[in-house]
Amino acid sequence: MTTLLAYALAALAEIAGCFAIWAWLRLGRSPLWLGPGLASLILFAVLLTRVESAAAGRAYAAYGGVYVAASLLWLWAAEGQRPDRWDLGGAALCLAGSAVVLLGPRG
């Protein structure tokens, strides 16, 4: 599995898991949402172990930008709220930072 695919799938799993808990606590949904939510969060953690990185902290840091961008896609697709220019600019900055962490020369 490529690093980018692992990050994308991890973001989807993390956001889905966190949203399940949000739905239970904030939207008054059934506690039955917690089962799939916790399973998604476990899948998220497993997927992050599949990225090509010698250090966990670097893998997590690079993932952060992907998470921000994916969260804004979730905002639009699942919650029906279109990200504004500030959201998009912030996501672009985060993705640029992730690229530096992920692709920067090591020595």
Swiss-Prot record:
Localization: Cell inner membrane
Identification of the protein by name: UPF0060 membrane protein M446_5886
Membrane-crossing residue ranges in chain numbering: 4-24, 31-51, 59-79, 85-105
Coiled coil segments of this chain: none
Keyword Cell membrane among UniProt keywords: yes
Keywords assigned: Cell inner membrane, Cell membrane, Membrane, Transmembrane, Transmembrane helix
Any one of the GO CC terms: plasma membrane
